Structures are given as C-alpha cells and as structure tokens.
C-alpha cells in the first residue's frame, strides 16, 4: 500500500515532478491590457489633459507598445553586442539616446 492510499488520497498521479503531454496549447496573453484606464488617465492628468475620449485608451496602449518594442529591441542589440545576457540600465539609456530621447541622470 502506498503512502497516498494510506492517507486516503487519490492514486495514479505522476510522482517526482514529471509532467505528461499537455492537452491544450498555452495562449499568449495581451499584457498591454495591464495598462489600465486609470493609469492612462493619471498620465494624461500629469500632461495637463482634462477630459479623455474613450478611443484614446486603446490608441495609447498601441503607441506605448510600439515605443517599448523599439526601445527594447535597441537595448537588446546593445546587450548582445557587449556579449552579455543581462540588459543594464545603460543599455536602455543608450537605446533612448539613439532614438533622440536623451535621458539624464544615469551616467556610469
């Protein structure tokens, strides 16, 4: 008698952390929707905006996705060129500078 049977538990499960074939493919989530409506509203308020129409929220998410994709792509290029596998803050600073958006306060 196994320990699971003696405790009254179910039997027949995998032991040792091994996992069988997956039945369903894992779908990729839209993480950009994590940028919530209140977060976009707060950013707009900081920029001096008083009222925001509904389509602006989705458009803001699309613009943010494009901007971050470009910055991350350039940052990874700097990291790979240096022969590293970890993106540093300076890689991001150089990527932003390359795009004409100089960020101050991160000199090494």
Swiss-Prot record:
UniProt GO BP: chromatin remodeling; nucleosome assembly; response to mercury ion
Keyword Nucleus: yes
Protein's cellular compartments: Nucleus; Chromosome
Gene Ontology cellular component annotations, sorted alphabetically: extracellular matrix; nucleosome; nucleus
Superkingdom classification of source: Eukaryota
Key words of the record: Chromosome, DNA-binding, Nucleosome core, Nucleus
Chief localization: nucleus
Pfam families: CENP-T_C
Gene Ontology molecular-function annotations: DNA binding; protein heterodimerization activity; structural constituent of chromatin
CDD domains per UniProt: HFD_H4
Bias kind Gly residues: ranges: 9-19
Keyword DNA-binding: yes
Quaternary structure and partners: The nucleosome is a histone octamer containing two molecules each of H2A, H2B, H3 and H4 assembled in one H3-H4 heterotetramer and two H2A-H2B heterodimers. The octamer wraps approximately 147 bp of DNA.
The family this protein is said to belong to: Belongs to the histone H4 family.
Protein name (Swiss-Prot/TrEMBL): Histone H4
Organism: Dictyostelium discoideum (Social amoeba)
Native organism taxonomy: Eukaryota, Amoebozoa, Evosea, Eumycetozoa, Dictyostelia
């Amino acid at each position: 008698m196994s320990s699971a049977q003696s405790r009254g538990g179910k039997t027949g499960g995998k032991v040792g952390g091994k996992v069988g074939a997956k039945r369903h493919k894992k779908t990729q989530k839209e993480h950009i929707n994590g940028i919530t409506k209140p977060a976009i509203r707060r950013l707009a308020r900081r920029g001096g905006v008083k009222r925001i129409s509904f389509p602006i929220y989705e458009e803001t998410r699309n613009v943010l996705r494009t901007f971050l994709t470009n910055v991350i792509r350039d940052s990874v290029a700097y990291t790979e060129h240096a022969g590293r596998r970890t993106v540093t803050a300076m890689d991001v600073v150089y990527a932003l500078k390359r795009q004409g958006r100089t960020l101050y306060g991160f000199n090494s």
